[in-house]
């Protein structure tokens, strides 16, 4: 892929930020599209915070909110990532990206389709590779995490959040002073 190829990432939450960071580390141009009020579980490591704060930095990668697609070039020139509020992805047809990555993690498709770019990728469940997008990346923790699926879907959403750290501590005897 050419270094000047445009990659649009829909979503700037914590998992999307990891994807964005990796793409930028490879020297690729990334534009992030977000909603008007993005929600992220781990906000301190989510570039979507730029929507609220005007800019956000995660692991040395700076994101800057822009108000129009035309402002993206000046942000890239600063070595930063532009973040545009465009929940429907209205700018995608005009921007003509080489790749669109759906990292919204809504557990369902909110409008990403294969005709948006020559290569379309979705993170997590709710998409069918070969139908909705070209590839799906497994996001469920475990031995399949990160697997690229070219036909079919990621593991369906169970509705039960994954455990991070300790979930429950059972004390069988009362503690004594």
Model regions and ranges:
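Residue-level detector of conserved catalytic or cofactor/ligand-binding positions
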Residues: 169-177
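Anionic-ligand binding region
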Residues: 146-167
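Buried, small/hydrophobic-residue-enriched core segments of structured protein domains
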Residues: 2-151
């Amino acid at each position: 892929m050419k270094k000047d190829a445009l990659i649009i990432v829909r979503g700037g939450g914590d998992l999307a930020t990891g994807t964005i960071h990796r793409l930028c580390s490879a020297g690729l141009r990334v534009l992030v599209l977000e909603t008007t009020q993005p929600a992220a579980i781990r906000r301190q490591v989510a570039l979507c915070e730029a929507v609220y704060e005007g800019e956000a930095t995660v692991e040395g990668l700076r994101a800057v909110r822009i108000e129009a697609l035309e402002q993206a070039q000046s942000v890239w020139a600063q070595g930063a990532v532009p973040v545009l509020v465009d929940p429907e992805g209205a700018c995608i047809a005009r921007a003509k990206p080489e790749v669109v990555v759906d990292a919204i993690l809504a557990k369902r498709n909110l409008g990403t389709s294969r005709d948006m770019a020559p290569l379309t990728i979705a993170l997590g469940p709710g998409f069918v590779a070969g139908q909705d997008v070209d590839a799906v990346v497994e996001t469920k923790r475990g031995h399949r995490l990160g697997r690229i699926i070219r036909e079919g879907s990621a593991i369906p959403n169970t509705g039960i959040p994954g455990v991070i750290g300790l979930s429950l501590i059972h004390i069988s005897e009362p503690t004594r002073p």
